[in-house]
Amino acid sequence: MQLVDTLKIKSYEKIKEFLNQEHVGRISSIDVNGFPQIIPMNFVFLNDSVYIHSHVKGEKLDNISKNNKVGFEADRELEFLPSYFEDPHNASLADTLYVSVVIKGIASLVSDRDEKTLALNGLMEKYQPEGYYDPLQSNMRVLNAVSVIKITPQTLHGKYKIGQHMNSKDRMN
């Protein structure tokens, strides 16, 4: 079995749980010069899609209007393992334990006011779970002042490296 198979998160529910816990994800689009542009963003995962909010103008939106294929990534570093725990002279043994999700998807601007409201309220619920805000309504003018980008996954892969790649004698059980 390849190492990649060992690291794969096989449960879609676990991937969703991870995405709902993380606060920052990164959207990658292609700029006018053909280079990747990666931007950290707050996000919410709702109805099997990623939603992010944005200003109504900007490079990210320009990129998406020209090429709607995007990447999205969220990760959590669990622990850095310095090499000297294994061998005081071999730096190649340093490692990082982590969880990550990578999405390749299609980005679109949300124009439906009900969907936009759902996404923005979802963001508020995620980042301010204690409440103390008034939920948005689809007829509010404030919806005109913000863009909502929806990323519809074409592929979605989760990976976790938590020591399962180590020999059993090297793991602390």
Write out the residue ranges for each language-model feature.
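Extreme N-terminal tail/first-helix region
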Residues: M1-N20
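Charged, gly/pro-rich active-site loop segments
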Residues: Q2-D5, P82-N173
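A generic structural signal for nonpolar/aromatic side chains embedded in well-ordered alpha-helices
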Residues: L19, N63-I64, L123
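Short beta-strand segments
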Residues: E22-V56, F72-E73
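A generic structural signal for short beta-strands and their flanking turns/coil linkers
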Residues: H23, I39, L46-D48, K66-V70, ...
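A short local loop/turn or secondary-structure capping micro-motif enriched for an aromatic residue
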Residues: L46-N47, E59-D62, F80-L81, N167-S168
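Hydrophobic/aromatic-rich structural module bridging two neighboring secondary-structure elements via a short loop
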Residues: H53-K60, S65
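Helix-adjacent hinge/juxtasegments
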Residues: D62-S65, K69-Y84, A91-A94
